[in-house]
Structure formats: structure tokens, C-alpha cells
């Protein structure tokens, strides 16, 4: 995992209310204080902004400026997703490990496996 993601994960942990994060002084601590709905709302907003930036970039002919806007919005989305992970006591490593688990497994195989597991769990 990149050092940047690791450091960001550490900052997020330090902003938790239990670790002394102050909602009056820290945007991250304020999100933690507001809870799940506030964090999820931000993720929804950032996901929508990412979609719009991507559509705009394609319409603009993938100029450097438009591509930069996509990167900017994806960074916001990643950031707020990492806030959610931290809020749920998960880390970027948990996501990296899941991606590693999926490596070499086609999307179609993954989908079929999930369907099979769901049927097994339902007792079918």
C-alpha cells in the first residue's frame, strides 16, 4: 500500500473522537461525530461529482484539464470512503487484501461464486 494511503489512514484514526479528535477543529472529527449518515451522504455526493467529471471529460475530448478534474474528484471519493472505513474500524489494508484476494479471478467467476454462496446460504 502506498505511504500516502497509510499516512492518511493514521490521520483518520487520530481524528476519531475516542482518540481526542475535536469536531470543532477537524473536518474529519466532525464527520465522525455526525455519524454514518453524514459520511454516507458525502460519499454519495463525491460519487456523483466523479461521474459528472468523467462524463464532462469524455465530452471535452479527454483534455488534460478534464482528466485532472476526474483525478481530483476520485481523490475526494477515495478520501471520504477512507473516512467510512475508519469509522467502521477498517483500514485501507482491508480493501487492498480484498483486491488481492480477487486478483486472477474474473468478474464473471466472482459473480457466479457470490450467487452460488447466496443460494447455499438460503438453503436452496
From Swiss-Prot:
Swiss-Prot/TrEMBL catalytic activity? 1-(5-phospho-beta-D-ribosyl)-ATP + H2O = 1-(5-phospho-beta-D-ribosyl)-5'-AMP + diphosphate + H(+)
Tagged with keyword Nucleotide-binding: yes
Q: What keywords is this UniProt entry annotated with?
A: Amino-acid biosynthesis, ATP-binding, Cytoplasm, Histidine biosynthesis, Hydrolase, Nucleotide-binding
Q: InterPro entries this protein is in?
A: HisE, PRib-ATP_PPHydrolase-like
Q: Name one GO cellular component term.
A: cytoplasm
Compartment(s) of residence: Cytoplasm
Q: What is its EC number?
A: 3.6.1.31
What GO annotations for molecular function exist for this entry? ATP binding; phosphoribosyl-ATP diphosphatase activity
Domain of life the protein comes from:
Bacteria
Its principal location? cytoplasm
On whether Cytoplasm is a keyword of this UniProt record, the answer is yes
Q: Which residues form the signal peptide?
A: none
Classification via Pfam families: PRA-PH
> Which pathway does the UniProt entry assign to this protein?
Amino-acid biosynthesis; L-histidine biosynthesis; L-histidine from 5-phospho-alpha-D-ribose 1-diphosphate: step 2/9
Mind listing the GO biological process terms from this record? Answer: L-histidine biosynthetic process
Family per record: Belongs to the PRA-PH family.
**PANTHER family from the xrefs?**
HISTIDINE BIOSYNTHESIS BIFUNCTIONAL PROTEIN, HISTIDINE BIOSYNTHESIS BIFUNCTIONAL PROTEIN HISIE
Protein name in UniProt: Phosphoribosyl-ATP pyrophosphatase
Species of origin: Ralstonia nicotianae (strain ATCC BAA-1114 / GMI1000) (Ralstonia solanacearum)
Amino acid at each position: 500500500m502506498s505511504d500516502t494511503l497509510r499516512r492518511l489512514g493514521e490521520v483518520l484514526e487520530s481524528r476519531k473522537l475516542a482518540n481526542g479528535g475535536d469536531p470543532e477543529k477537524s473536518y474529519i472529527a466532525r464527520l465522525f461525530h455526525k455519524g454514518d449518515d453524514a459520511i454516507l451522504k458525502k460519499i454519495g455526493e463525491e460519487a456523483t461529482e466523479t461521474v459528472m467529471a468523467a462524463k464532462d471529460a469524455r465530452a471535452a475530448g479527454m483534455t488534460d484539464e478534464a482528466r485532472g478534474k476526474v483525478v481530483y474528484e476520485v481523490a475526494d471519493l477515495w478520501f471520504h470512503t477512507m473516512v467510512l472505513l475508519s469509522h467502521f474500524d477498517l483500514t485501507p489494508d482491508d480493501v487492498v487484501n480484498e483486491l488481492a484476494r480477487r486478483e486472477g479471478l474474473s468478474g464473471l467467476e466472482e459473480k457466479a461464486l457470490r450467487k452460488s454462496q447466496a443460494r447455499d446460504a438460503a438453503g436452496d
